[in-house]
Amino acid sequence: SQVGAQIRDVPTEHVGEYMARLFIGHWDRDEHRNPIVSLIYAALSDTTAAAMLREFITVNFTLPVVERVGADRPQLRAALLAAQLLGFGLSRYVLAFDALTSTPSAELVAVLGATLQHTCTSPLSAAERQS
């Protein structure tokens, strides 16, 4: 995948920021956002569209990043990342939460990037965090 090729040169400690920058930069452009939003709407009522969206975001975006990092439970981490990204995308670009639409993209990249970084590289369970 394109992301898989690009992510090779990104230091592990910056993969969350990289993902956030790529995702927000992509969604900020109408020509990219509109087809994704259409697919999301379709996925809400059509299982085939839902499967296409799941595959698109995990195979082409989140799973290559998790595999690059080499973290445990890659499928779970990729799904969690997809949920965070899609939730953010819906909240900013479809539901238009004012706090998200009025905050500069660069600031959102930093905040979302930290969350994505945690999901990529930190222990997932409380037991793992304590050991």
Give each language-model segment a name:
Residues 50-54, 65-119, 123-129:
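Hydrophobic/aromatic-rich alpha-helical bundle segments in the mid-to-C-terminal region
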Residues 2-36:
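Hydrophobic alpha-helical connector segments
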Residues 28-56:
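Amphipathic alpha-helical segments used for helix-helix packing
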Residues 19, 23, 60-64, 111-112:
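Amphipathic alpha-helices of TPR/Sel1-like and other helical repeat/solenoid scaffolds
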Residues 4-6, 38-42, 99:
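Short linear capping/connector segments at secondary-structure termini
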Residues 23, 36-43, 81-85, 89:
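Short alpha-helical scaffolding segments that buttress acidic/His motifs in well-ordered protein cores
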